[in-house]
């Protein structure tokens, strides 16, 4: 065990406020334990980042939470490695090792608070009013008349029920997949339709089918109320219902680590090729407001 240095010279005169608990007593092999704690924090932090996937952007509130969690991991490892929870004499040592993480947490909290206050609607109403530019126009010229036979007669809930029935056409794999919540109404070949992606039935069916990907998608005609299953020559390998590296937002995060992403939507082009549309957003008022 490393030697304990205690001042008996009187230079550190007792002012009535210090006690035995204020004597800094490092645990045995403290240097080695610090190195191990740092390495474990980096490893656990990497795992945490993999699952949280925060944008490396000060406008992302998830980034602040991620850094706070990493600091808390280091503090917890310091307490465990020093055994301060059963040996109170090591508490001053833990407090000393906690200074930098503690200061970092307070600094991030201050930055986040100021960033939030500078974006509060009450203080920045004028800025919010300028988010959308207003342009004058002529309704009769800007909005063309449409054929009433092209007016959608289904709502999203009814269209999803038709999609669930249409999934039965995937007879060879119908038990492996379900209709996903990702559906979008678009104009496809001048016809209003709702396109719906598939999802894996459960984790075991994902394990069985993830290599081939999602084999099809469904089109529901919003005027004729007919559903069509469209098989793909190659399955969709990335989607919001995937896991690990094929999870859509994780795949995008590793390619674009600083971007702020909005919710993805599923669409197809005029040739029927499927796409995931993921908007990139920016915060223009304060740190977290004015999307």
Model-derived regions, located:
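Soluble extracytoplasmic regions of secretory-pathway and membrane proteins
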Residues: 2-291
């Amino acid at each position: 065990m490393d030697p304990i240095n205690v001042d008996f010279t009187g230079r550190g005169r007792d002012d009535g406020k210090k006690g035995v608990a204020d004597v800094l007593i490092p645990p045995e092999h403290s240097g080695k334990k610090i190195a191990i704690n740092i390495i474990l924090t980096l490893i656990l932090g990497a795992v945490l980042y993999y699952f949280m996937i925060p944008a490396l952007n000060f406008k992302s509130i998830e980034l602040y939470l991620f850094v706070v969690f990493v600091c808390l991991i280091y503090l917890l490892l310091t307490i465990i490695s020093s055994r301060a929870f059963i040996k109170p004499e090591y508490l001053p040592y833990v407090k000393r090792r906690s200074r930098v993480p503690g200061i970092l947490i307070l600094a991030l909290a201050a930055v986040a608070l100021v960033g939030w206050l500078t974006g509060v609607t009450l203080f920045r109403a004028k800025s919010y009013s300028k988010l959308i530019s207003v342009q004058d126009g002529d309704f009769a010229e800007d909005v063309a008349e449409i054929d009433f036979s092209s007016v959608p007669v289904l709502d999203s809930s009814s269209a999803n029920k038709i999609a669930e029935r249409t999934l039965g056409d995937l007879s060879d794999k119908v038990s492996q997949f379900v209709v996903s919540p990702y559906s979008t109404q678009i104009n496809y070949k001048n016809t209003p339709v709702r396109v719906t992606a598939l999802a894996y039935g459960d984790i075991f069916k994902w394990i069985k089918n993830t290599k081939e990907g999602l084999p099809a998608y469904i089109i529901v005609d919003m005027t004729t109320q007919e559903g069509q299953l469209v098989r793909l020559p190659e399955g969709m390998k990335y989607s919001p219902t995937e896991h690990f590296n094929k999870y859509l937002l994780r795949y995008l995060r590793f390619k674009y680590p600083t971007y702020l992403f909005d919710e993805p939507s599923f669409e197809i082009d005029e040739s029927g090729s499927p796409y995931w549309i993921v908007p990139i957003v920016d915060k223009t008022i304060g740190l977290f407001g004015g999307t």
